[in-house]
Amino acid sequence: MKKVIILGSTGSIGTQTLDVIKNFRENFEIVGLTAYNNVELLSKQIREFNPKVVAVKDEDKANQLRENLKKNVEILTGSKGLQEIVKYDADLVVVAVEGIAGLIPTVTAIQRGKDIALANKEVLVTAGQIVMDLVKKKDITLLPVDSEHSAILQCLRGNDKKEVSRLILTASGGPFRGKKKEDLRKVTVNEALNHPNWKMGKKITIDSATLMNKGFEVIEAKWLFDISEDKIDVIVHPQSIIHSMVEYIDGSVIAQLAAADMRIPIQYALNYPTRNYINGINFLDFSLTTQLTFEKPDLETFRCLSLAYEALKIGGTMTTVLNAADEIAVSLFLNKKIEFLQIAEIIEESMKEHNNIQNPTLDDIINVDKEVKEKIAKKYMR
């Protein structure tokens, strides 16, 4: 039986991970769960899955949780709670918590020799070199939960990495595919949150609308698969049936196809290297799939993707700046403090102003993240 800790169990990926685990209760034991502030849902999860330990953001939430529960479960709090919970006996840590808050717990879990199922983008976007060096040193397995990276992993299995010509990440194009800059000047938050294919959290949905999500995935792919950025391409595929592809040096292309359901890559990460049937999964009916279309991304309109490639080429803390500026810019947009197109403008401005640090430490990364966010907030939250 595989012992599992889920960081961010009340979010989109966390709840779907537990939904998958319900299918294989005999194979998994939930050791720990964490939540930011959704105590009500966390209480339900505790009753259903009986973890030994949980963690929440602050003491008030912890007290609320104690009042809700009659079970004997240890409750940790704060950022230290996230770091402590991954020290408990477990085989796999699912990192589904959002933001830079996922970095230190992930590093701590790897240092403790635990395998990682990674759904947090910030970990590799900001500290890819540090994290993957540690993965090799500790000889653990780090598995991607993203549908695109899971697809690449599946397309690479059984093949020699030396024979890879390029990785091709597919993008749906988001809700504004085909629009030009002028069309996007007055888009609303609700319009940006209306993703055509995927049901996701608000932050990642906005990142999908700007194509920054795909930019982050390019950076992650570099570190996950140890490949240079000039061998990672992005293609817009509106149907979201092909989740990504690998092209080999003989011209062959291997693609992974599936319904747009995050439970499929979650299942693959949980059960790796085997596969299992999941109740309620839709199987593709190719007789109903009338066409698969592809187009180049519009880098002039959706500049965030270009900025991600630029940050990756520069290296060092520039990807941390990219991530931090995007995180707060998206928050400002969601709170109607800025317009949609200002997201890319704020990111570019932050990158231009940054004094880059090559080969940063974890402290450097955390400090740069904090400085960038504070600077943007001070300017736009007046």
From Swiss-Prot:
Binding positions (NADPH): T10, G11, S12, I13, N38, N120, E122, G201
EC number(s) recorded for this UniProt protein: 1.1.1.267
Pathway recorded for this protein: Isoprenoid biosynthesis; isopentenyl diphosphate biosynthesis via DXP pathway; isopentenyl diphosphate from 1-deoxy-D-xylulose 5-phosphate: step 1/6
Cross-referenced Pfam families: DXP_redisom_C, DXP_reductoisom, DXPR_C
Cofactors, names only: Mg(2+); Mn(2+)
Reactions listed under catalytic activity: 2-C-methyl-D-erythritol 4-phosphate + NADP(+) = 1-deoxy-D-xylulose 5-phosphate + NADPH + H(+)
InterPro entries registered for this protein in UniProt: DXP_reductoisomerase, DXP_reductoisomerase_C, DXP_reductoisomerase_N, DXPR_C, DXPR_C_sf, NAD(P)-bd_dom_sf
NCBIfam families the UniProt entry points to: Dxr, PRK12464.1
Function noted in UniProt: Catalyzes the NADPH-dependent rearrangement and reduction of 1-deoxy-D-xylulose-5-phosphate (DXP) to 2-C-methyl-D-erythritol 4-phosphate (MEP).
Family, similarity comment: Belongs to the DXR family.
HAMAP family assigned to the protein according to its UniProt record, in alphabetical order: DXP_reductoisom (MF_00183)
Name of the featured protein: 1-deoxy-D-xylulose 5-phosphate reductoisomerase
Organism: Thermoanaerobacter pseudethanolicus (strain ATCC 33223 / 39E) (Clostridium thermohydrosulfuricum)
